[in-house]
């Protein structure tokens, strides 16, 4: 088995390692540990700044440790699982834990969403993957007032799965920085990643911090301070940059917009997702019911270039017939989030993939609503609400929270007629350009104060 795949190893680039060392505010670091040190790049970067500190590294890969012992003999090394019981046999490590504990933990732990275990925290059980269990271990072995600088999957900041855990984390540590790392930083990883800088709280100072800084790190290793969020019980516990930027933009729009703004759920009578054809290829046929996948949803239209049909007689699709005037919205996939189209009135019934949401609406013109969702107002919400590290997705609950600018009915009808006229044109680049121009017209109209 490939050693990288076996141990989920994706080593830290030198520039990122040096950046992580640089943002730690404490100049008086005496002990540093990395429980999954890989090629020990983080500890070597730390050595450049804290030359007189003691460095401790653990890794499960024995071959790597042999190289590290020859290259960086100053590191106290241990071969084993950084979360395993065998650490009890590491004497120098145990001596520090019995004393003041470690000043700094610096880490790029292995990521594996499916390597999950139940962990009890304050009498509450959490199902946590290996990377989050490493974070908990660091909170255990770092001294009060000590720092943890750790790389995690970006989904940790947004997934509902971690919502309560993120709240509990604020009781144990001050989160000084949340930083989204630029795409492509780690070779061989398609997942988005983030960097957290935390400081373990003093037991006698159990206060709740008032705000968290959320920033973006570009490929020049320059930080852009995008936003600072206030922490209170009424704030949705999401720490991802896109969502927090979305909240700020929505507040700005609500203050300036001259038209009513309503939540999408006010107009939705039915919201459903479709079914997958994976493993069901026998259901496809030359004639039957049209099956729509995200690849069929182009810019504000449904492509007919390579149609797929499924059997009319099979019960698998029985309850997901999609009626004309339903709105299709991309549910999952980075390239699909933000896709929208309407099933026009002249379409017969269709069925859809589970990668799509289908909305049936009343009280608002569906053609106008589809156009609105394609504007910057709609797109920033669809993309800002998306969650996850690898494959972004939107939940039904979040989708229904999208805010809709609702002009007068005559305005909705005006844009409806223009949209319908364009939809009857031949599919192609010219039609796509005209649709984009129409969306731009809608945006300019809604931006009027």
Predicted segments with their positions:
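Class I S-adenosyl-L-methionine
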Residues: 1-71, 75, 86, 158, ...
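Conserved proline-anchored active-site loop of SAM-dependent methyltransferases
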Residues: 20-23, 32-46, 81-82, 96-119, ...
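Conserved Class I SAM-dependent methyltransferase catalytic core
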Residues: 62, 127-183, 195
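S-adenosyl-L-methionine
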Residues: 73-94
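Basic, amphipathic alpha-helical recognition segments used for DNA target recognition
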Residues: 202-204, 298, 348-349, 354-410
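Non-catalytic DNA-recognition/assembly elements of restriction-modification systems
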Residues: 220-282, 408-449
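Sequence-specific dsDNA recognition surfaces
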Residues: 265-280, 295-324
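A short beta-sheet element
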Residues: 317-320, 324-373
């Amino acid at each position: 088995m490939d050693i990288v795949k076996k141990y989920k190893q994706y080593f830290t680039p030198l520039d990122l390692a040096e950046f992580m060392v640089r943002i730690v505010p404490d100049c008086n670091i005496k002990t540093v540990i990395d429980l999954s040190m890989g090629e020990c790049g983080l500890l070597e970067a730390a050595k450049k700044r804290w030359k007189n500190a003691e460095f401790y590294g653990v890794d499960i890969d024995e071959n790597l440790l042999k190289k590290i012992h020859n290259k960086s003999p100053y590191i106290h090394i241990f071969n084993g699982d950084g979360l395993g019981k065998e650490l009890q046999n590491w004497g120098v490590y145990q001596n520090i834990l019995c004393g003041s504990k470690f000043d700094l933990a610096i880490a790029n732990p292995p990521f594996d969403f499916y390597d999950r275990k139940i962990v009890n925290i304050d009498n509450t059980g959490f199902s946590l993957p290996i990377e989050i269990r490493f974070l908990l271990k660091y909170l255990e072995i770092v001294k009060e007032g000590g720092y943890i600088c750790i790389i995690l999957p970006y989904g940790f900041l947004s997934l509902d799965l971690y919502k309560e855990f993120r709240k509990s984390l604020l009781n144990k540590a001050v989160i000084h920085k949340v930083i989204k790392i630029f795409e492509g930083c780690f070779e061989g990883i398609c997942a988005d990643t983030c960097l957290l800088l935390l400081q373990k709280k003093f037991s006698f100072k159990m206060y709740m911090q008032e705000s968290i800084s959320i920033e973006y790190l570009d490929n020049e290793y320059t930080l852009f301070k995008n936003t600072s969020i206030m922490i209170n019980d009424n704030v949705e516990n999401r720490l991802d940059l896109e969502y927090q930027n979305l909240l700020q933009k929505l507040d700005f729009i609500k203050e300036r917009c001259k038209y009513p703004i309503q939540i999408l759920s006010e107009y939705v009578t039915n919201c459903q997702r479709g079914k997958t054809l994976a493993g069901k290829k026998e259901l496809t046929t030359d004639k039957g019911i049209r099956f729509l996948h995200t690849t069929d949803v182009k810019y504000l239209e449904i492509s007919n270039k390579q149609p797929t049909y499924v059997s009319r007689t099979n019960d698998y699709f029985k309850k997901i017939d999609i009626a004309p005037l339903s709105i299709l919205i991309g549910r999952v996939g980075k390239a699909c989030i933000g896709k929208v189209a309407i099933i026009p009135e002249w379409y017969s019934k269709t069925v859809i993939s589970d990668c799509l949401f289908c909305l049936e609406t009343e009280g608002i013109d569906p053609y106008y609503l589809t156009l609105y969702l394609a504007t910057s107002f709609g797109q920033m919400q669809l993309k800002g609400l998306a969650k996850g590290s690898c494959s972004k997705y939107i939940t039904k609950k979040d989708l229904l929270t999208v805010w809709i600018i609702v002009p007068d009915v005559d305005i909705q009808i005006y844009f409806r007629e223009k949209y319908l006229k364009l939809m009857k044109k031949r599919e192609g680049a010219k039609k796509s350009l005209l649709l984009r121009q129409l969306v731009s017209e809608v945006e300019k109209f809604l931006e009027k104060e």
